[in-house]
Amino acid sequence: MSQQAAAVTKVTFKVTLTSDPKLPFRVFSVPEEAPFTAVLKFAAEEFKVPAQTSAIITNDGVGINPQQIAGNVFLKHGSELRLIPRDRVGGISRAR
């Protein structure tokens, strides 16, 4: 293992799937320099939901722009995030 590979700094995220009533979560570590789009795709694959129609938000409900690196997201928003399929965003439940 090279010294350069050993020096890679990682950040750890706990991602919860909000569309499941049981609120399952996954914890994973990624390189600090990883594009957050890759984190979103990986999290979506872990929960078997389509990445193209999913978003990651904070526990406070703030949307996260995926066009940044994982380290910046970690510094701005912390480690606890939520994965939400976009078909659930702004949806209105109508009882008939």
Curated annotation (Swiss-Prot):
UniProt cross-link Glycyl lysine isopeptide (Gly-Lys) (interchain with K-? in acceptor proteins), position: 90
Highest rank taxon of the organism: Eukaryota
Positions of the pro-segment in this chain: 91-96
GO BP annotations, alphabetical order: protein ufmylation
Alphabetically ordered keywords of this record: Isopeptide bond, Ubl conjugation pathway
Family of this protein: Belongs to the UFM1 family.
UniProt protein name: Ubiquitin-fold modifier 1
Organism: Chlamydomonas reinhardtii (Chlamydomonas smithii)
